[in-house]
Amino acid sequence: MSSGANGNSKSLAYDIKFTKLFINGEFVDSISGSTFETIDPATEEVLATVAEGREEDVDLAVKAAREAFDNGPWPRLSGEARRKILLKFADLIEENADEIATLEVIDTGKPFQIARYVENSWTSETFRYFAGAADKIRGATLKMSSDFQAYTLREPIGVVGHIIPWNAPAYLFAMKVAPALAAGCTVVIKPAENTPLVGLFMAYLSKLAGVPDGVINVVNGFGSTAGAAVSSHMDIDAVTFTGSTKVGRTIMQAAAASNLKPVSLELGGKSPFIVFDDADIEKAAEIAVLGVLSNKGELCVAGSRVFVHEGIYDAFVKKLEATVKNWATGDRFDAATRHGPQNNKQQYEKVLSYIELGKKEGATLVTGGKPFGNKGYYIEPTLFTNVTDEMTIAKEEIFGPVIMVLKFKTIEEVIRRANATTYGLAAGIMTKNIDIANTVTRSIRAGSVWVNCYLALDRDTPFGGYKMSGFGREQGLEALEHYLQVKTVTTPIYNSPWL
């Protein structure tokens, strides 16, 4: 692969403006002066040297957020006032869409078409959605069975820590920050160390939008230091995390050991995509590929276990192979490209090791399975067939461009096998039979089930997992619940003039 084919010239030409921490409305160096490098996954070259926040920097950010919450205007503004600022924030995201998308491309490796025309739209619209909720947070009046009356207040929980992963930094920033701000909370954000650039640019836009100082704070750094400080901080009132189940467990332990702060977790997945024998084979193959190869397979919801009815297995595999081979890999800034490099070297090597393990355990490698080009963390879109449930690639989350096909006979069998996982994030069903669709939908233990589609996400649809895929919901009005507390106010009604 030539340098032009992997986006090298575009990466080097881009001027990265923000590399420091963002605390109390200002870009500042870390207290220790420590820095780290962020790498372009397409070129393996350094994009920028970024300030490295540690425990003392997190503490400074929390103090700013606490002051902004306890004594600042944000939680005391009317919902209408917060709405206007969040709408301005959304407008600025839209106006700076090219710059945000470029940062996302060079920091994550995803194709520009996805970053610019899919995820950037989701990001701005998520802020608009929760802006619309800011002035609609209300309590209830309660009629008690005694000489008292009561009503409830739904109040912001306080300072929230957000730990954001590297696969979709702009969109996940919006998913976490927008509802927290709409509720009246202040936030401390720890972006992934592999993708710090988007969060810093979003912090800059928040200042332009009129978000008061201290309401949004961004501390770049590593999970073992900055992330651990967020999850264990005694003055953070709640925390959210998207990432691996292993790290999610660590965050829960830290939250419990500190101040028992509530935690919302969106964790790993090994989602089933079930194709019944009445499905449109061509459409099912297209959706199956979309459900795994989108974002280079770096999707928590990837429907990577593709269960196919034995009656259409051979025909489906043939169509699936052709679809995978047509998934264009190359220059991330080329409009035709659908597949870029894995985000980082560690993930690249992990995916390749799973591919080798799949071959060793007896799965049939149909296409792909090798590095692509001579530079960058590119892996060919990969398809395995003759996969069985006990194989490691069928049980563990790979988080890469690897599709595996498994054969089934009956609806009862496939439901049992689909549920035979510690995860429960999502599932897909392809069938023309409404009875089959309803039966499987109600039997699958997963937070999202897509029928005759996949990845059909929307601002109004709650998203989250069952089992070890986590708990709590993002998107939809349900997302607000993690950022609000209910207070009950009770008063006597003796001698009231209306009695």
UniProtKB/Swiss-Prot annotation:
Keywords: NAD, Oxidoreductase. It comes from Tanacetum cinerariifolium (Dalmatian daisy). CDD domains: ALDH_F1-2_Ald2-like (cd07091). Expressed in flowers and disk florets. InterPro entries: Ald_DH/histidinol_DH, Ald_DH_C, Ald_DH_CS_GLU, Ald_DH_N, Aldehyde_DH_dom. Its EC number is 1.2.1.5, 1.2.1.-. It holds the Pfam family Aldedh. Belongs to the aldehyde dehydrogenase family. NAD(+) binds at residues 164-167, 190-193, 223-224, 243-248, 266-268, 346-350, 397-399. Homotetramer. This is Aldehyde dehydrogenase 1. The active site is at E266 (proton acceptor), C300 (nucleophile).
